[in-house]
């Protein structure tokens, strides 16, 4: 399944205006979609020479599927980082995601397996989608390499799945799709200020309350000296944290690098 699920994407040629007569009525383009009736792969990638010779519009019809697969891969990687031994995966983290997922298939949890099965379903049914994102060669990497916060994964994934309502992907329930946990926002403690206790009066009171003594000055010097820069971690762990985690809870796309 790993081989069929995690294939690299290729480019496809869009039907030109000359072939408009052969397009079925069901696949006619609207304002937000691009018609792509011929589903056979040419097997040839576009080169600069062909683009210069022909100025007709080209598209990447699998962009819709690639976006969904990217969202799933990020969630799978986050799941692996949370629930599995970090040191065990550090040596293999810079390999393709397919190798990591195939090795963890037998020891993964049920919800992670449901992600893999849904990925396989998306791979087998990508050609059933009639609405595709237009592809611009100057911004070809922005769609697949764009960092997406985990809080945005669920709504974007559901909006993408609604496009292909006719495929077997729609048989999955919302409970199976909503596996991304909501991040609970920490409630900030607020204090009501009376007329007598304004921020300026509190600041003046604290400033008067602390007299300038030698003890306080010595303590402040000791505290300043004790604040030494943290020791840098090992090279592997540093690269690991920089590459796969950040403060914004963004997981980089490993597959389409």
From Swiss-Prot:
Known DNA-binding region: 58-132
Primary localisation category: nucleus
Domain of life per record: Eukaryota
Listed GO MF terms: DNA binding
Region (Disordered): 210-239
GO cellular component, one term: nucleus
Keywords associated with the record: Activator, DNA-binding, Nucleus, Transcription, Transcription regulation
Annotated compartments: Nucleus
Family per record: Belongs to the MATA2 family.
Extra remark beyond the main annotation: There are three genetic loci for mating type genes in K.lactis. MAT is the expression locus that determines the mating type of the cell, whereas HML (containing HMLALPHA1, HMLALPHA2 and HMLALPHA3) and HMR (containing HMRA1 and HMRA2) represent silenced repositories of mating type information. The mating type is determined by the MAT locus, which contains either a copy of HML or of HMR. Diploid cells are usually heterozygous for the MAT locus.
Purpose: Mating type proteins are sequence specific DNA-binding proteins that act as master switches in yeast differentiation by controlling gene expression in a cell type-specific fashion. Transcriptional activator that induces the transcription of a-specific genes.
Protein's recorded name: Mating-type protein A2
Gene this chain is encoded by: MATA2
């Amino acid at each position: 399944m790993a081989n069929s699920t995690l294939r690299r994407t290729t480019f496809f040629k869009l039907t030109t205006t000359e072939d408009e007569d052969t397009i079925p009525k069901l696949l006619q383009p609207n304002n937000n979609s691009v018609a792509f009736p011929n589903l056979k792969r040419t097997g040839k990638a576009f080169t600069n020479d062909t683009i210069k010779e022909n100025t007709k519009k080209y598209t990447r019809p699998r962009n819709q599927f690639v976006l969904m697969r990217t969202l799933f891969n990020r969630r799978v990687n986050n799941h692996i980082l949370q629930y599995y031994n970090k040191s065990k995966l550090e040596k293999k983290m810079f390999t393709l995601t397919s190798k990591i997922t195939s090795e963890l298939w037998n020891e993964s949890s049920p919800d992670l397996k449901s992600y893999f099965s849904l990925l396989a379903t998306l791979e087998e049914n990508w050609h059933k989608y009639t609405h595709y994102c237009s592809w611009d060669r100057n911004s070809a990497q922005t769609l697949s390499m764009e960092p997406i916060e985990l809080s945005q994964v669920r709504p974007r994934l559901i909006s993408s799945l609604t496009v292909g309502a006719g495929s077997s992907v729609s048989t999955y329930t919302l409970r199976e799709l909503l596996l991304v946990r909501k991040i609970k926002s920490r409630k900030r403690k607020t204090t009501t200020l009376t007329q007598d206790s304004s921020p300026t009066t509190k600041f003046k009171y604290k400033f008067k309350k602390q007299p300038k003594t030698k003890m306080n000055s010595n303590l402040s010097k000791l505290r300043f000296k004790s604040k030494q820069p943290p020791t840098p971690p090992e090279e592997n762990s540093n690269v690991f944290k920089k590459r796969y985690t950040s403060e914004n809870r963004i997981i980089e796309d490993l597959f389409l690098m």
